[in-house]
Regions:
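Short alpha-helical elements
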Residues: 1-265
């Protein structure tokens, strides 16, 4: 337990630097544990409920950390990753995240794994250093390219590197005209103006693929037992925030920010 308490104390001290306030709800009574100090004080169900309520605040914390890690960048990477809620054989009788039609899971296809799955898809933009700038969750059936409509309102004056799923001259023109974003993707060999993808861009794209692998292997982002969409989305947010927090601790300790398997205290 000594290591756990050491990690907890370190993370709590960093949170106090970002936000001196301890509680974020207007309560008539003084709570036994603040919204930050949760370890060993409350039951899991209470913790999950409080975490769902603090989803907006968690994202604010994450954005503050991102701004300290990478205030601005001239190059970003964009990609998506499938998130299953259940196996295909159980999809028709599954009741997970089925509160509303707008947020219910759907069937989708993942070209990288050559599989049809049932669930959601996470769209993410990260820097060349491997820091998640923005992300969103959509139904699995939503095409990757539609996330670019959100990106143009979040980024500007930069290069955006994606895979063939983002190949579209119309979106390229729209991004450049509206936000001065230069979208760069590999071209299909059947295109008239085909030219090989630059090795520099191909190498840069490996960073976001590595981040997704770390989220799967070390944070079990695909293992999610939430029953509601709010709970599902909050757990995804918490795991990405945990990764960003470790990167921030690494930066402060003089370590490589993407060396996630280290002692943080």
């Amino acid at each position: 337990m000594s290591n756990l308490h050491a990690f907890y104390t370190k993370i709590l001290s960093l949170l106090h630097e970002l936000e001196p306030m301890d509680n974020f709800f207007n309560q008539t009574r003084v709570p036994k544990a603040s919204d930050k100090t949760l370890i060993g004080r409350i039951e899991r169900s209470v913790y999950n409920r409080r975490r769902r309520q603090l989803g907006v605040k968690i994202e604010q914390f994450r954005q503050q950390i991102v701004n300290q890690l990478s205030p601005s960048s001239l190059c970003y990477l964009i990609d998506s990753m499938p998130l299953e809620t259940c196996k295909i054989s159980r999809a028709k009788r599954s009741r997970i995240c089925q509160e509303t039609e707008q947020t219910s899971p759907d069937y989708g296809y993942c070209a990288a794994h050559n599989m049809i799955y049932f669930g959601y898809k996470i769209h993410a933009v990260c820097t060349q250093q491997g820091i998640f700038k923005t992300f969103d969750i959509s139904k699995a059936s939503v095409h990757d390219i539609h996330y670019l409509d959100d990106v143009k309102n979040q980024l500007n004056h930069c290069i955006l590197i994606g895979d063939k799923g983002y190949l579209s001259r119309q979106y390229q023109r729209d991004l450049f005209d509206s936000a001065a974003i230069e979208l760069t993707t590999p071209k299909r060999t059947s295109q008239v103006d085909f030219e090989p993808f630059k090795p520099l861009y191909r190498k840069a794209r490996k960073r976001i693929e590595t981040l997704f692998s770390q989220l799967c292997d070390q944070f079990n982002i695909r293992r999610n037992y939430a029953k509601s969409f709010t709970g599902f989305a909050t757990r995804i947010l918490s795991k990405i925030t945990a990764l960003t927090m470790i990167q921030w601790i690494n930066l402060r300790n003089g370590n490589h920010i993407n060396n996630l398997k280290i002692v943080v205290a």
